[in-house]
Amino acid sequence: MSRYRGPRVRIIRRLGALPGLTSKTPQLKSSSINQSTSNKKISQYRIRLEEKQKLRFHYGITERQLLNYVRIARKAKGSTGEVLLQLLEMRLDNVIFRLGMAPTIPGARQLVNHRHILVNDYVVDIPSYRCKPQDFITIKNQQKSETIISKNIEFYQKYKIPNHLTYSSLEKKGLINQILDRESIGLKINELLVVEYYSRQA
């Protein structure tokens, strides 16, 4: 399944707020519609499916990519669900988003694809690049790169940066301090339901 490029508002109306996909918040429809929906019997499969879709759309990844992350998480030590979230959060495009250098993860991915971003002083143009503690993220020393990202930072750094990251406005430099903990995830998600969804596939 390819990466979603359709209307984002339609997705958040169905799944709830997905800050990585869009900064817009879902507007609830009339109470009569909500009540009729709540009265329907929702299957366990659908509940798991929707949690899985939240991860896919929030992080902007394909079905195949998510399944691959689940397989990696299963082989790692610790809680599969928590490891899965850590893998997704340490993607370069997500780190740029969480630092406030881009308004959304698709926006961060575009910065990476257009070679505006350096990791440890080297240009990295792979959005899925897995960052690690003590990696530092900087902007390519070009006026276009600095202008684009400076505008984003001025606006989006009013939101709190998670504890595992720091950003120096003076140096225009982001630092990954450590692997994040569960409380720092920027998404309302039940990762165990996602693991259960893939239990027969991973």
UniProtKB/Swiss-Prot annotation:
InterPro entries: Ribosomal_uS4, Ribosomal_uS4_bac-type, Ribosomal_uS4_CS, Ribosomal_uS4_N, S4_RNA-bd, S4_RNA-bd_sf. It is found in: Plastid, Chloroplast. The keyword RNA-binding applies. SMART domains: Ribosomal_S4, S4. Disulfide bonds: none annotated. One of its GO terms (cellular component) is small ribosomal subunit. Residues 90-153 form the S4 RNA-binding domain. It holds the Pfam family Ribosomal_S4. Gene3D superfamilies: Ribosomal Protein S4 Delta 41, Chain A, domain 1, RNA-binding S4 domain. It comes from the Eukaryota. One of the primary rRNA binding proteins, it binds directly to 16S rRNA where it nucleates assembly of the body of the 30S subunit. Part of the 30S ribosomal subunit. Contacts protein S5. The interaction surface between S4 and S5 is involved in control of translational fidelity. Belongs to the universal ribosomal protein uS4 family. This is Small ribosomal subunit protein uS4c. The lineage of its organism: Eukaryota, Viridiplantae, Streptophyta, Embryophyta, Bryophyta.
